[in-house]
């Protein structure tokens, strides 16, 4: 039974457990419920399922560079089906002020929110165990972060250059 696709570093596409939204496949995906393209600006609510090349898939990961450099993205609500926020997935989203990280996410990848200078606070759910290298580096507007006991690894420079950070709980 085929449930999704996953892109590998060599760009060959293999069918796996779920769809990883990446910069390369993003424009080929539409919201399964509405049939409309997934927006990359404003207040975005990511769908739990998408249609990709005529087949329906559950979104399981926000992959590398999926929203990188989307300067008009202001908020994002990630569906419960997502378990990983990948490398550089939201890097350079200068106007991103709000993000909802769902309970199913276990890993926030390297550079995931790098340079999201308008992000003010982040609440990391109890399911997260790893915060990747430089995950929030350069988030100058970040004033508070809630890190649960479930996090067992905070990689090098995860919160480096967060000059406004005053509260970590």
Where are the regions that the model predicts?
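Structural signature of tandem-repeat unit edges
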Residues: 8-11, 16-19, 39-61, 71-84, ...
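Short beta-strand/loop segment at the start of cytosolic alpha/beta domains
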Residues: 1-37
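Short, surface-exposed, low-complexity cationic segments
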Residues: 32-33, 43-45, 65
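Consensus positions within tandem repeat domains that build extended binding/scaffold surfaces
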Residues: 63-66, 86-91, 109-114, 132-135, ...
């Amino acid at each position: 039974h085929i449930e999704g696709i996953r892109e590998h570093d060599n760009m060959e596409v293999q069918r796996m457990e779920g769809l990883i939204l990446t910069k390369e496949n993003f424009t080929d995906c539409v919201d399964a419920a509405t049939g409309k393209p997934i927006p990359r600006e404003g207040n975005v609510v990511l769908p739990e399922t998408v249609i990709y090349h005529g087949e329906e898939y559950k979104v399981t990961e926000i992959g590398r560079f999926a929203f990188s450099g989307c300067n008009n993205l202001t908020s994002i609500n990630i569906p419960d089906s997502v378990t990983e926020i990948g490398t550089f997935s939201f890097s350079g989203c200068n106007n991103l002020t709000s993000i909802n990280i769902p309970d199913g996410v276990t890993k926030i990848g390297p550079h995931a929110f790098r340079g999201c200078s308008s992000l003010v606070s982040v609440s990391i759910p109890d399911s997260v165990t790893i915060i990747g290298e430089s995950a929030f580096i350069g988030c100058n507007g970040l004033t508070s972060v809630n890190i649960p006991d479930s996090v067992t690894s905070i990689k090098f420079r995860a919160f480096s250059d967060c000059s406004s950070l005053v509260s970590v709980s």
